């Protein structure tokens, strides 16, 4: 309060001084008033002083020498916050105003463009919000350049924009603008650069674009535009870059594009364009970047591409192209990257690259993933030494690896997996000093793994599985200190596992299964603290498995097939090792008393043998007694602790078990390593009807407590008959137990018997989202709480998808709210337990979500179910959270489907009907509308039209308006 009074007093004195002293002009007053509305944490504006009547010396200010008035104000990246005050309207001679890359908030003042001299306005990179006022462009005078990019502006583009006939540069990218482009936008005949990318704009591009003869750059990417690519775009003869990627454009490329003779970049990826790639594409001689990926182009690659001598980046991936790659591509000597993966190419597709007539090449990336054919890989020639990424996987290549492929010393990634390559791995492999990924898996390679592999010191992933490699694993592999993945499975490797592997501290994944490895496991592997997967199954490994840490939870399937391996995992005890008996040398004799000594030796040997026999008998007798006592103790201990803890769970009417003579003992695993975690003294109350929290398709959830009093939730699974084996169950549990995210419920452990499986996870005190939305009518979530919940669910799902886990069952009852109001996704990963029964269970309703949440692809057996089904469920959840209504509700004579109701309301402009009436209008429309639209997009009937959850998170973070506090 005191500071506010001082600021007002200061401004009053400034105004009085201005009236009293004619030298104190409007510029000084305007700048001081503007500064008063800012927070300047770095004191960048310390030189702005009302006692200094000459602002021309102030930081960021530039004056016109003719008038001695401020003509430029540049405060970009000053770390300023606050709002853009009206004081700047006093700067009548200002022609450049740059406030970019700060943290300014608030809405746009429609009067700024009215400054008669103003030519450049740059407010980009701030946190401005609200709509662009209709009056912002109505009297734009001599305005030349406007950038409002990277803010949080909402609403539609004002029609008044067409009045700014002098505008040459317009950038409204990376906001939350929606609606259609104004039809009169192409009246801006002076436009040279237009960027509307990364918004929510939609509809067809209006006619008239071809009238912008001076247009150099246009970027409409990452929107929801549809229809055809404008047919008159070729009339923009000055165009240098065109980006329409990540939209919904369809149809063929318009022939008028061949007139874009000055264009250097064409990006059309991620649309639904069809037809063949036209021959005239090779007539755009200035092209440097051509990206037509992720469309529906068919036919062959035109030979005319070889005419593009300046081409640097060519991406034709993820189309339906066929035939061969034209050899004319070798004429494109400036190519840096080419990606033609995920097509149907046949024939000799590499000849153009390996028989180039250039002495040098700048090619650094080549990808030809997934195509059909059985060609040989031609020798790598020297002009490809700049290659950094080479992906030739899944192509049916035959022959040997090129002996000189290792001269590609710049390679970061080499993938030749899933071909029919044979022969040995060249010893020059060590020349790949900077390579991070080497994948030669699923081939017919033989011979040994050369010790020179240790020269590839930057290697992070080594995939050589499914080959015919023999010999030993070289100890020098430990030189590759960055390795996190080693997969040598399904080969013919022999010998012992080198102890040097234990020095690879970053290792997370080791698979040496299905080889002929022998010897004992080196003790050094116990040091590998980051291990997630360790598989040595089906070898001849002997000795004892390590104990403790990761190896406590290793599945039986990871070590099975090693008959001489012992330890708790294989349920085989390790025999004690006794010192060898002393053997006397019978040839050591004294010539003087040979016979006597011989007899003495015999007596000694006999006595030693007798002692050994007696000792062995005693050891056996003691061992039998000890084992008996230990068994008695162990049985009583198990019954007191683990068995009591687990079997007590069957007490109560919902856990009644049929009597059996042989009591079944289970396996209890807590990922924290805690022992005796359950308080078993009150077994009757551990899991019974009174402690039940809820029921679902997979089982019943109960609340109980650990011995230290911490509450946990325990789920009794009801899908026991569908789970294949204990090993698969435990493997999946360990994967789920490693997941840690604030928006995902933590799995703490599990319990297994053949007839009973329990999941132990954290107890979330706030209950389900369903209860918060549809439970107590007197409780109403605020908008801020609802937005936080939506964002939390999105982040949790994105995390699960990044961990290759699909939920399959997104609904309000599977989202829990903790005491802090944070959303946590629960009940995830359970479908993975069902293995081959998954499809049957999905279609029978075991995994399906409740009514209204189920993605339409579940009803079609021919459609692959992917993680996009979760995106659909999320979209329905978003609408449920915003509206407060269930996905499907029943009226007297009708069924109301939420998604359809919201879509109709939004299209008809009845936004208030799309938001929970209990909020009584207390919500920011600039947040609510984009959130609703996002929910509708996520709930699209077509899986490919739904965004990925990672993208959804980014969109929500853009939508969020921290300046609004509507609690």
Swiss-Prot record:
Record bears the keyword Signal: yes
Chief location of this protein within or outside the cell: membrane
Name the UniProt record assigns to this protein: Leucine-rich repeat receptor-like protein kinase PXC2
Recorded domain comment: The protein kinase domain is predicted to be catalytically inactive.
Matches recorded under Pfam families: LRR_1, LRR_8, LRRNT_2, PK_Tyr_Ser-Thr
Keyword ATP-binding: yes
Residues the record marks as carrying a glycan: 103, 127, 171, 219, 296, 315, 331, 374, 415, 446, 479, 487, 516, 535, 540, 571, 587
Membrane topology of this protein: Single-pass type I membrane protein
UniProt-listed SUPFAM superfamilies: L domain-like, Protein kinase-like (PK-like), RNI-like
Keywords for the protein's UniProt record, in alphabetical order: ATP-binding, Cell membrane, Glycoprotein, Leucine-rich repeat, Membrane, Nucleotide-binding, Receptor, Repeat, Signal, Transmembrane, Transmembrane helix
A GO CC annotation given for this chain: plasma membrane
Signal peptide: 1-20
Cytoplasmic topological segments: 631-967
Tissue specificity note: Expressed in the vascular strands of cotyledons, the shoot apex, hypocotyls, roots, leaves, stems and flowers.
Ranges occupied by LRR repeats: 91-114, 115-139, 141-164, 165-189, 191-212, 214-236, 237-260, 262-284, 285-307, 308-332, 334-356, 384-408, 410-432, 433-456, 457-480, 482-503, 504-528, 530-552
Residue stretches making up the Protein kinase domain: 687-959
Extracellular side: 21-609
Organism whose genome encodes this protein: Arabidopsis thaliana
Annotated InterPro entries: Kinase-like_dom_sf, Leu-rich_rpt, Leu-rich_rpt_typical-subtyp, LRR_dom_sf, LRR_N_plant-typ, Plant_RL_S/T_kinase, Prot_kinase_dom, Protein_kinase_ATP_BS
């Amino acid at each position: 309060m005191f500071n506010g009074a001082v600021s007002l007093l200061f401004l009053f004195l400034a105004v009085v001084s201005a009236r009293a002293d004619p030298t104190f002009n409007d510029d000084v007053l305007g700048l001081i008033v503007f500064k008063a509305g800012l927070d300047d944490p770095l004191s960048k504006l310390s030189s702005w002083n009302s006692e200094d009547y000459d602002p021309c010396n102030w930081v960021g200010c530039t004056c016109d020498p003719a008038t001695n008035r401020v003509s430029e104000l540049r405060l970009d990246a000053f770390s300023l916050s606050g709002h853009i005050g009206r004081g700047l309207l006093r700067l009548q001679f200002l022609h450049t105003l740059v406030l970019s890359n700060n943290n300014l908030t608030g809405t746009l003042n429609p009067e700024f463009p009215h400054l008669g001299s103003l030519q450049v306005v740059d407010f980009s990179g701030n946190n401005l919000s609200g709509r662009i006022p209709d009056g912002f462009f109505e009297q734009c005078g001599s305005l030349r350049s406007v950038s409002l990019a990277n803010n949080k502006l909402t609403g539609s583009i004002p029609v008044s924009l067409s009045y700014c006939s002098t505008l040459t540069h317009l950038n409204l990218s990376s906001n939350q603008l929606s609606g259609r482009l104004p039809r009169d936008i192409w009246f801006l005949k002076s436009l040279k650069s237009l960027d509307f990318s990364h918004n929510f704009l939609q509809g067809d591009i209006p006619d008239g674009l071809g009238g912008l003869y001076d247009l150099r750059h246009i970027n409409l990417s990452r929107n929801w535009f549809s229809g055809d690519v404008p047919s008159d775009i070729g009339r923009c003869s000055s165009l240098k870059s065109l980006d329409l990627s990540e939209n919904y454009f369809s149809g063929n490329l318009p022939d008028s594009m061949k007139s874009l003779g000055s264009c250097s970049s064409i990006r059309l990826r991620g649309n639904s364009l069809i037809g063949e790639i036209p021959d005239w594409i090779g007539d755009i001689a200035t092209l440097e970047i051509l990206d037509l990926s992720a469309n529906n182009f068919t036919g062959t690659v035109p030979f005319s591409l070889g005419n593009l001598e300046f081409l640097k980046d060519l991406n034709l991936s993820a189309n339906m192209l066929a035939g061969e790659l034209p050899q004319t591509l070798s004429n494109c000597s400036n190519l840096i990257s080419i990606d033609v993966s995920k097509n149907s190419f046949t024939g000799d597709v590499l000849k153009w690259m390996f028989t180039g007539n250039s002495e040098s090449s700048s090619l650094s990336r080549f990808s030809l993933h997934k195509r059909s054919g059985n060609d040989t890989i031609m020798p790598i020639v020297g002009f490809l030494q700049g290659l950094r990424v080479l992906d030739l996987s899944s192509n049916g290549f035959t022959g040997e690896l090129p002996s000189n492929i290792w001269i590609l010393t710049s390679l970061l990634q080499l993938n030749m997996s899933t071909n029919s390559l044979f022969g040995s791995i060249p010893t020059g492999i060590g020349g790949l000093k900077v390579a991070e990924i080497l994948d030669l898996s699923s081939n017919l390679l033989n011979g040994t793994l050369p010790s020179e592999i240790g020269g590839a010191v930057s290697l992070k992933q080594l995939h050589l599985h499914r080959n015919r490699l023999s010999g030993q694993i070289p100890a020098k592999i430990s030189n590759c200190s960055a390795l996190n993945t080693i997969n040598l499975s399904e080969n013919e490797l022999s010998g012992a596992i080198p102890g040097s592997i234990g020095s690879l501290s970053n290792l997370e994944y080791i698979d040496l299964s299905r080889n002929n490895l022998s010897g004992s496991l080196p003790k050094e592997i116990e040091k590998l603290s980051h291990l997630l997967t360790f598989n040595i199954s089906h070898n001849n490994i002997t000795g004892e498995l390590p104990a403790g840490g990761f190896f406590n939870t290793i599945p039986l399937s990871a070590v099975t097939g090693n008959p001489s391996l012992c330890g708790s995992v294989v349920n085989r005890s390790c025999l004690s090792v006794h010192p060898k008996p002393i053997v006397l040398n019978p040839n050591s004799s004294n010539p003087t008393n040979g016979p006597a000594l011989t007899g003495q030796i015999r007596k000694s040997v006999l006595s030693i043998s007798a002692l050994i026999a007696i000792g062995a008998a005693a050891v056996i007798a003691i061992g039998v007694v000890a084992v008996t006592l230990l068994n008695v103790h162990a049985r009583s201990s198990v019954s007191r602790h683990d068995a009591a803890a687990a079997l007590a769970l069957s007490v109560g009417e919902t856990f009644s078990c049929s009597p059996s003579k042989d009591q079944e003992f289970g396996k209890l695993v807590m990922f924290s390593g805690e022992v005796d975690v359950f308080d078993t003294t009150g077994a009757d109350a551990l899991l019974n009807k009174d402690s039940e929290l809820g029921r679902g398709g997979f089982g019943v959830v109960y609340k109980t407590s650990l011995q230290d009093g911490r509450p946990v939730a325990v789920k009794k699974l009801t899908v026991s008959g569908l789970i294949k084996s204990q090993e698969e169950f435990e493997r999946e549990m360990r994967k789920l137990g490693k997941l840690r995210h604030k928006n995902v419920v933590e799995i703490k452990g599990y319990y297994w018997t053949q007839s009973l499986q329990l999941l132990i996870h954290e107890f979330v005190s706030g209950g389900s989202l369903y209860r918060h939305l549809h439970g107590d009518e007197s409780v109403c979530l605020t908008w801020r709480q609802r937005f936080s919940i939506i964002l939390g669910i999105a982040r949790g799902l994105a995390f699960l998808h990044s961990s290759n886990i699909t939920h399959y069952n997104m609904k309000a009852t599977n989202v829990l709210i903790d005491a802090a109001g944070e959303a946590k996704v629960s009940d995830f990963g359970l479908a993975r337990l069902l293995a081959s029964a998954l499809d049957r269970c999905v279609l029978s309703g075991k995994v399906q979500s409740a009514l209204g949440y189920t993605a339409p692809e579940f009803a079609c057996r021919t459609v692959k179910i992917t993680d996009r089904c979760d995106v659909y469920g999320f979209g329905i959840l978003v609408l449920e959270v915003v509206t407060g209504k269930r996905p499907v509700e029943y009226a007297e004579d009708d069924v109301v489907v939420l998604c359809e109701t919201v879509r109709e309301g939004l299209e008809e402009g009845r936004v208030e009907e799309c938001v929970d009436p209990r909020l009584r209008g207390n919500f920011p429309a600039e947040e609510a509308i984009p959130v609703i639209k996002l929910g509708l997009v996520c709930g699209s009937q077509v899986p490919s039209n739904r965004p990925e959850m990672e993208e959804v998170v980014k969109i929500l973070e853009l939508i969020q308006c921290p300046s609004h506090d509507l609690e």
